[in-house]
Amino acid sequence: MGLPWYRVHTVVLNDPGRLLAVHIMHTALVAGWAGSMALYELAVFDPSDPVLDPMWRQGMFVIPFMTRLGITNSWGGWSITGGTITNPGIWSYEGVAGAHIVFSGLCFLAAIWHWVYWDLEIFCDERTGKPSLDLPKIFGIHLFLSGVACFGFGAFHVTGLYGPGIWVSDPYGLTGKVQSVNPAWGVEGFDPFVPGGIASHHIAAGTLGILAGLFHLSVRPPQRLYKGLRMGNIETVLSSSIAAVFFAAFVVAGTMWYGSATTPIELFGPTRYQWDQGYFQQEIYRRVGTGLAENQSLSEAWSKIPEKLAFYDYIGNNPAKGGLFRAGSMDNGDGIAIGWLGHPLFRDKEGRELFVRRMPTFFETFPVVLVDGDGIVRADVPFRRAESKYSVEQVGVTVEFYGGELNGVSYSDPATVKKYARRAQLGEIFELDRATLKSDGVFRSSPRGWFTFGHASFALLFFFGHIWHGSRTLFRDVFAGIDPDLDAQVEFGAFQKLGDPTTRRQVV
């Protein structure tokens, strides 16, 4: 046809057979990418330390999505929760990846078949003999089938009636595992952090989809509505489909960035708001306070804090700390976490307990300031020593560790105290291996950040695509230069200006 590059799919506009072919090929590409990406991630994934080197620290992108849907075992003999297994079954990580690749191959062959055999009887209008699609009927079919899939997922897969269930965890991401979920039909089902809402909403939405699909299969649209919404134009389908996709992309960008039951922190990493609000820090202090109330020593109380909980309370796991254009996993940034050094407790020479003010998310550098329990500044690391009043040396600050690898160790040397005060700005202190991956020490974002950025960006792009194609289909006659109020039969080529009888061409 000699179309320019930006006309992309115009070639299949009036060709239902090949329109179907390119959509099947698109599905083949998507499924093929998913399967291949899964195999690549499995090849580089290290499952040995699910606490300090989980999937999200390693930059895994598709493994978390498989895991939240109930896949936990590998044909390599490991489980995502740690330990070894002997019989992973067919639906392991590799099994799912292989199924996607096989499906991709079948779609590839189907796409070729439909490209070659494009002129099928099913695409022909009996009355005119020309290629034609009954778009309202196709809409009904798709709505019905997607409703069945949606209902089936909620009623069988999520509930464990016929399926594994989904990943469910506690609010602090410590006890996560795959389990069946009962639908939440009360008001609690609208809480985005309640897993039961996933089951109930899929059942409800699926039921609605089935009923709506049957409605559109059995009821024809009124002529005025059909013409007003251009229901006979395939570009209307494109426009409304893009709308559905960009709306979904905006929704999942939100649920990922702000957190929800569908995006567990064990699989995707914590959210930035958990750092901003001191979410894990408060829980750690609550547990320590409970231990002290039970007559435990500080050392005993801090030693009972799970390493996993302490690791969440570290700024390097904040997805907003990594720049959008810093490629690589979190492990490539600050390194692979080896162990928790323990909680540093600072005191001045008068015995007051001091707390290091933590670095806010969007700061790269931050002054080291130590405050007492009332928030009064008692010590700092000054920029200009000549004018300092609260320096570590002047105030006589010491540090002692509780829990972790340095449990019971104390330091009074100012240089060492300042070193740990600087590190305490970043939350709990961990030993990090930067040699293995040649990590550069610059923070990276987690898959939570990448997913959000990608989906928000494409949602914005697709929003403009919806406006573009929607206006093209609604105002097609205007763009073509044909007056919609013109009743007379227009003979193309009879006038110099289309539809203007005053410009009739003169026959010489």
Swiss-Prot record:
GO terms for biological process: photosynthetic electron transport in photosystem II. It is a multi-pass membrane protein. Binds multiple chlorophylls. PSII binds additional chlorophylls, carotenoids and specific lipids. InterPro entries: PS_antenna-like, PS_II_antenna-like_sf, PSII_PsbB. The chain crosses the membrane at residues 21-36, 101-115, 140-156, 203-218, 237-252, 457-472. GO terms for cellular component: chloroplast thylakoid membrane; photosystem II. One of the components of the core complex of photosystem II (PSII). It binds chlorophyll and helps catalyze the primary light-induced photochemical processes of PSII. PSII is a light-driven water:plastoquinone oxidoreductase, using light energy to abstract electrons from H(2)O, generating O(2) and a proton gradient subsequently used for ATP formation. This is Photosystem II CP47 reaction center protein.
